[in-house]
Amino acid sequence: MYKDQIIQFWKSINIFQEFEKIKEIFIEQKESSEELLNKYRDTIHIKKKGALLFCVFGGKLSEGINFKDELGRAVITIGLPFPNTNNLEIKLQMAHIDKMKNKYGNNFRLSSSSYYESLCFKLINQAIGRSIRHINDYAVILLIDFRYGEAKYISQIPKWIQKSIKTSGSILEEITNFFKFHSKEKL
């Protein structure tokens, strides 16, 4: 699983260990339960310590649970979660779309490639939406993949987020300024 590869890489270069010095880390597994979520919430609400929660696109925690306010101050996505093209259901759906496109030509607006991309961005947008739940909520959203530089991918992100997108070589400074701004708002 890609998440496990990222974590292993971070451990090999000691980034993961640096995270552990600052925050308690929780990692979603296939069998993740309510217990993991409760421990995460307790760390934030009771211990007032903050925490990192690693989830996967399409997993229970990235789709069905809200992380409003201090439960979700950052969403960091790495890569694009395109579905497996060898999945039978996806193959059949794309073949049907291609058949309809051939039959109706330009009158049939959907293409198999746009359908495939929409499946990917549905997952991304669901994950992003877990952390910003009301008008006064805020979170840093990091979309880490070179393909986000392409207009066709940016256009799949909600318009209200598109307005705030920045590409940055000094991301740490940008994030620090973001949280300084929101800390001052509360005073």
Predicted regions and their residues:
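ASCE RecA-like P-loop NTPase motor cores
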Residues: 1-187
